[in-house]
């Protein structure tokens, strides 16, 4: 059975790149009837925060990416927080030391930095060897560390050989001999380095596939070497293309919103965000663009993951969100819009006038790209606009007749509203375009908006007459 994981660090909000990684792992796990695991990589003690972990979990749940095992749901391979697995890492680090594949380094950070600068000054890559690093391991230094209560770092001795990766996305990748030197696996504070911890965890959690961004490709040679050192089977790796901004540069804050939480708060639907992210580096075999999560699972395959960078197009996301909003059932449309309507009315009012609010939303749904636009689009239905429209005497006369016609209407429906329009304009020289355009501005304070018949029907007889009378003095 396939087992895939998403392993974020709780050092910030869920970036769209991380969300896409989670999505691809989720889709393949579900497609193959396997397991999707959430693991929290919180070994960066200074930057990891509980609130970020909660934010990551909430953002993933909002997207609909439910996991089978994780810190909140448990499982057979826990704990699922790296900070709760430190003894496990130490056990395997000691094993490498015993086998002569790793060694202790009693060097201070500034000494490592000086060594790095020296190598660079000599025109060499900053690749360390056991000989270089163990020059600091003297009896005096060991005593000094013990006296200060310090612990040595542990370095893995990188075999000087060529490594070959058959990547799911990139194909055959060759890491030439000497690509990397010896590297730390345990810091002097006892906390494991990323490359070491994730290898131990992926092996012990029986992870079969690792799908991640290609910014991790350089880490892979270190991880393959560790798998070989332990004589463990290596999972299948797939490195998906980077996400770039519209200017073809790495996606960052300067391009606008980049976290899932930002898009959620701006009124994007989770199914739209998921749909959009899926198409950043993957394509449907028939070129289909609008899909829900189940359709994505059915269509997903690893062979359609692209090698080229994906462009994050905010306009495409807005269009996709609009499409998903229009495809919602009436009840669901009201449900997702509710929090934006509460700016003007109470929950009870929405529930008691459900049909009215559904018609209101249907009247504006073709204008909505972000749900956060709803308050501005519906404001005039609840708050009378402060507007002055220059009306000719002829138009005023027609509007006075319109008031009289409306006052006679007993059943407020589209047919009677349209008949009132016709009756008011009968015999007048006022053109229909002027009549309707200025009526819209008088009633809404705007030149554009929902169909005028919807505006008049939804505002209701009393409001329409009140606004017309106020404007006509």
Curated annotation (Swiss-Prot):
GO terms for biological process: glutamyl-tRNA aminoacylation. A motif ('HIGH' region) lies at residues 8-18. GO terms for cellular component: cytosol. Its EC number is 6.1.1.17. ATP binds at residue 253. The keyword Kinase does not apply. GO terms for molecular function: ATP binding; glutamate-tRNA ligase activity; tRNA binding; zinc ion binding. The keyword Cytoplasm applies. Keywords: Aminoacyl-tRNA synthetase, ATP-binding, Cytoplasm, Ligase, Nucleotide-binding, Protein biosynthesis. A motif ('KMSKS' region) lies at residues 250-254. It catalyses: tRNA(Glu) + L-glutamate + ATP = L-glutamyl-tRNA(Glu) + AMP + diphosphate. InterPro entries: aa-tRNA-synth_I_cd-bd, aa-tRNA-synth_I_codon-bd_sub2, aa-tRNA-synth_I_CS, aa_tRNA-synth_I_cd-bd_sf, Glu-tRNA-ligase_bac/mito, Glu/Gln-tRNA-synth, Glu/Gln-tRNA-synth_Ib_cat-dom, GluQ/Sye. NCBIfam families: gltX_bact (TIGR00464). Belongs to the class-I aminoacyl-tRNA synthetase family. Glutamate--tRNA ligase type 1 subfamily. This is Glutamate--tRNA ligase 1. It comes from Thermosipho melanesiensis (strain DSM 12029 / CIP 104789 / BI429).
């Amino acid at each position: 059975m396939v087992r895939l994981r998403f392993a974020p660090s709780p050092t910030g909000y869920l970036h769209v790149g991380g969300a896409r990684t989670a999505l691809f792992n989720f889709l393949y796990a579900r497609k193959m009837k396997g397991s999707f695991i959430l693991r929290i990589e919180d070994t960066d003690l200074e930057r990891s925060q509980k609130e970020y972990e909660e934010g990551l979990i909430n953002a993933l749940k909002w997207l609909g990416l439910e996991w089978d095992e994780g810190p909140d749901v448990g499982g057979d391979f826990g704990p699922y927080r790296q900070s709760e697995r430190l003894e496990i890492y130490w056990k395997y680090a000691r094993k490498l030391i015993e086998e002569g594949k790793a060694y202790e380094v009693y060097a201070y950070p500034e000494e490592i930095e000086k060594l790095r600068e020296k190598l660079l000054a000599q025109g060499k890559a900053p690749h360390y060897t056991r000989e270089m690093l163990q020059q600091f391991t003297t009896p005096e230094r060991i005593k000094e560390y013990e006296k200060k209560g310090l612990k040595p770092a542990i370095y893995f001795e990188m075999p000087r050989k060529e490594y070959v990766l058959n990547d799911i996305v990139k194909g055959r990748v060759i890491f030439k001999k000497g690509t990397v030197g010896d590297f730390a696996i345990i810091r002097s504070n006892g906390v494991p380095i990323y490359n070491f911890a994730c290898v131990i965890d992926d092996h012990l959690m029986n992870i079969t596939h690792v799908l991640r961004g290609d910014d991790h490709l350089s880490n892979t040679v270190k991880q393959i070497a560790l798998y070989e050192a332990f004589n463990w089977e290596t999972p299948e790796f797939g490195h998906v293309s980077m996400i770039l901004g519209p200017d073809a540069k790495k996606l960052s804050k300067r391009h606008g919103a980049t976290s899932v939480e930002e898009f959620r708060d701006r009124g994007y639907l989770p199914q739209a965000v998921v749909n959009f992210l899926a198409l950043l580096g993957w394509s449907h075999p028939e070129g289909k663009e609008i899909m829900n999560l189940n359709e994505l699972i059915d269509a997903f395959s690893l062979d359609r993951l692209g090698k080229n960078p994906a462009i994050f197009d905010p306009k495409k996301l807005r269009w996709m969100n609009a499409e998903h909003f229009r495809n919602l059932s009436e009840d669901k449309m009201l449900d997702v819009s509710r929090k934006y309507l509460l700016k003007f009315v109470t929950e009870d009012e929405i529930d008691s006038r459900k049909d009215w609010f559904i018609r209101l939303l249907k009247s504006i749904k073709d204008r909505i790209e972000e749900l956060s636009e709803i308050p501005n689009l519906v404001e005039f239905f609840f708050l009378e606009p402060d507007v002055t429209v220059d009306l000719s005497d002829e138009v005023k006369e027609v509007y006075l007749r319109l008031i009289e016609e409306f006052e006679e209407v007993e059943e407020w429906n589209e047919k009677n509203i349209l008949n009132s329009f016709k009756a008011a304009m009968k015999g007048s020289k006022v053109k229909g375009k002027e009549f309707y355009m200025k009526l819209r501005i008088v009633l809404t304070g705007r030149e554009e908006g929902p169909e005028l018949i919807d505006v008049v029907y939804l505002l209701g007889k009393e409001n329409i007459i009140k606004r017309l009378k106020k404007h006509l003095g």
